[in-house]
Amino acid sequence: MEKSVRGWESVDFFEVDNVERPDEPIAPGAHCLVYGPKESGKTTLLFQHALSVANRDPSARVMFVCKRDAIEARPPLLQRASTLGDGAGRIQMKYLNNDAELRRLGSVIHLLPPETLPTLIVIDGMTSFFAPAQGGDNREREMRLARTLASLHECADSCGRMRSEHVVEGEQCLLLASCPA
């Protein structure tokens, strides 16, 4: 098996000439949260990264998790379909509605055959899956969010271990989530 350690490449996020690239890449194996104002381009950034990863590595499998109504109302800004590359076919869209479905996905994803496990899990609009707390007390909602993030972190690590054992030695699965400010 060929050793492959996939990390975050600045080129994945910054393919525009007038955007300054960071000096240091994000450490391999590190998971990442993209945080910013509502409608600031987080979905476009996430999808561009997913596409870049899938185009760069033919063995990459990307799972892009989002709410269908949100992605249809404000789709990511993309290049023309003819220039998306072969990687677009390796991005699996998964539409979920709430935090229970998100936790369920994280608890069963390891049942997939190792070669179909994702190498990148993208969660667009993480907090949108969690209903607002009734009565104004958000502690319970925040605890569910924290537990779900921890579960998804473990899910990504497990997918990476399984792919490393059965597909490509040293391969990882990274978790990338967005959250509006």
What are these regions (language model features)?
Residues 28-32, 49, 58-61, 87-92, ...:
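Core residues of folded domains in eukaryotic genome-function proteins
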